[in-house]
Amino acid sequence: MISIQKYVRAKSLEEAYQLNQSRANRVIGGMLWIKTGNGSVNTAIDLCDLGLDGIEETQEAFLIGAMTSLRRMELHQGLNTYTQGAAGAAVRDIIGVQFRNLATVGGSIWGRFGFSDVLTFFLSLETFVELYQGGIVPLEQFAALGYDRDILVRLIVKKKPGVFAYRAFRNQRTDLPVLTCALSRMEGEYRAVIGARPGRAIVVRDEEGLLSGGQTEGRYNAFSAYVARVVPMGSNTRGSAAYRTHLARVLTERNLMQIMESGGK
């Protein structure tokens, strides 16, 4: 069990940032995974009063505040229209509605959890993170970094024309995923993202041109096999490395078929 000595609702990002410079303090987000750990927090920093709990849609992008709940993301009409329903599909099996009403997008992204559906999904989009001190950084770059004392303010998803698909395999519906797989085709570039390896999600691009020159079943098989071959897998209680490699091929191919059927030829 985690113990908290002091609770502060930050009045500004500057106040939250300054408090967070002490290693004994912590930004709490939705407080769902943090409370399952052990240890002591001197000051728990809550960002709930800073107006970061919504999704703003502009002509160029979606601006998703760090305190936006997964449930709000799941139900957001604009985001789901843009991603052909992939946004909702990426989070709908995360525990339950009550959990998704509390869990935050920022907490999920900052945690860079190896089991994260959220990280897998957003890596398949043209996504950037806005950090209070670090500025705007591509999510793919941010996902590979270590943890520091900065504050994640929001996600920025550029509206790059494309088609999208998301699938995950779970041993039971509300369990943590055995493997996650997002796939996108934006302006001719295919991007497959594999997570729950078990490890942070990895982006795979069609660097060998396996999908160029027209989409066929043979090309889908070749690219799916390529993704399964290049992504490092591991074993845990939910599945073996060999099983995850098999799932990567199957889920990638099914996402490719979905993209083709939705007009991504």
Give, region by region, the residue ranges found by the protein language model.
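C-terminal structural segment of proteins
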Residues: M1-K265
